[in-house]
Amino acid sequence: MSTPFKMERGVKYRDAAKTSIIPVKNIDPNQDLLKKPEWMKIKLPASSAKIESIKNGMRRHGLHSVCEEASCPNLHECFNHGTATFMILGAICTRRCPFCDVAHGKPLPPDPEEPQKLAETIQDMKLKYVVITSVDRDDLPDRGAGHFSECVKAVRELNPNIKIEILVPDFRGRVTQALEKLKDNPPDVFNHNLENVPRLYKEIRPGADYGWSLKLLREFKEMFPNIPTKSGLMVGLGETNEEILQVMQDLRDNGVTMLTLGQYLQPSRHHLPVARYVPPTEFDEFRDKANEMGFEHAACGPFVRSSYHADLQASGGLVK
């Protein structure tokens, strides 16, 4: 009889240790993988000085970026431009989504000094637009919403002219309570990712619920009708184009005005494999459909991620 897997608090579990406890066993690390097409190859910048500067600044203040923790393919480009997406509430997620490279485990309690550290780091970096996201914190009574609110408050106090976008989890089972905490310090853009299509949620987003996510986006929009709401999707996980179009329509029906759509990339052999690589022309077609549906801004392209050039997205610029 095998010994049950026991996690230690504060320890990051990745790759096989993470995926071994996912309910749906659908990952074979030895399977053949699709060859990456030419359009998915990234040219790295010649200099890494700016990249190291941002990494060192994060370490100095004990902060995390989702760019590093989730192994984002755009890290070099964004860091080289002096931008980063800050990840609050630690670097250990209570969920274990098999598409995501963020570590799973039992997280430590929130750092009460993190809001001030975040505000000071943003001030040091002289940012005009910032994205703040977090891991899922299903272990907290408010799922981390109060900490989000405190971070927004601290950042605004020290950086009065900044624009703030928050990319939030689904606040599992606590949507109403979470929004009550967020309403005291609302962002300039409210972002929550649906990720993919409801048919694949059990496989892709164990612990999440498509209806909860739509409810969160809808109720925030009802509370703050003048604040843009935004959501992101990945393609290449086994969905059909028709299913993606239906999700896009569901987003519009729930008041979402900004969309990001990008190619899923497998972080390691212990994550879900890429089912197909979507060519750039199809992303252009998705963007055209999004415009027809009434999205005010749609960033669609192979390397587009939820916070990729978020400042340009918010100002209405073309991102692809």
Swiss-Prot record:
Enzyme class: transferase
PROSITE patterns per the UniProt record, alphabetical: RADICAL_SAM (PS51918)
CDD domains given in the database record: Radical_SAM
Catalytic activity as recorded in UniProt: [[Fe-S] cluster scaffold protein carrying a second [4Fe-4S](2+) cluster] + N(6)-octanoyl-L-lysyl-[protein] + 2 oxidized [2Fe-2S]-[ferredoxin] + 2 S-adenosyl-L-methionine + 4 H(+) = [[Fe-S] cluster scaffold protein] + N(6)-[(R)-dihydrolipoyl]-L-lysyl-[protein] + 4 Fe(3+) + 2 hydrogen sulfide + 2 5'-deoxyadenosine + 2 L-methionine + 2 reduced [2Fe-2S]-[ferredoxin]
Any one GO molecular function term: 4 iron, 4 sulfur cluster binding
Residues at which [4Fe-4S] cluster 1 binds: C67, C72, C78, S307
GO CC annotation, single: cytoplasm
Keyword hit for Iron: yes
Pathway(s) this gene product operates in, as recorded in its UniProt entry: Protein modification; protein lipoylation via endogenous pathway; protein N(6)-(lipoyl)lysine from octanoyl-[acyl-carrier-protein]: step 2/2
Pfam families in alphabetical order: Radical_SAM
Binding site residues for [4Fe-4S] cluster 2: C93, C97, C100
Cofactor-binding details, from the entry: Binds 2 [4Fe-4S] clusters per subunit. One cluster is coordinated with 3 cysteines and an exchangeable S-adenosyl-L-methionine.
InterPro entries in the cross-refs: Aldolase_TIM, Elp3/MiaA/NifB-like_rSAM, Lipoyl_synth, rSAM
Metal-binding among keywords: yes
Domain annotation Radical SAM core: ranges: 79-296
Entry keywords, A to Z: 4Fe-4S, Cytoplasm, Iron, Iron-sulfur, Metal-binding, S-adenosyl-L-methionine, Transferase
Family indicated by similarity: Belongs to the radical SAM superfamily. Lipoyl synthase family.
PANTHER family per UniProt: LIPOYL SYNTHASE, LIPOYL SYNTHASE, MITOCHONDRIAL
Protein name, as recorded: Lipoyl synthase
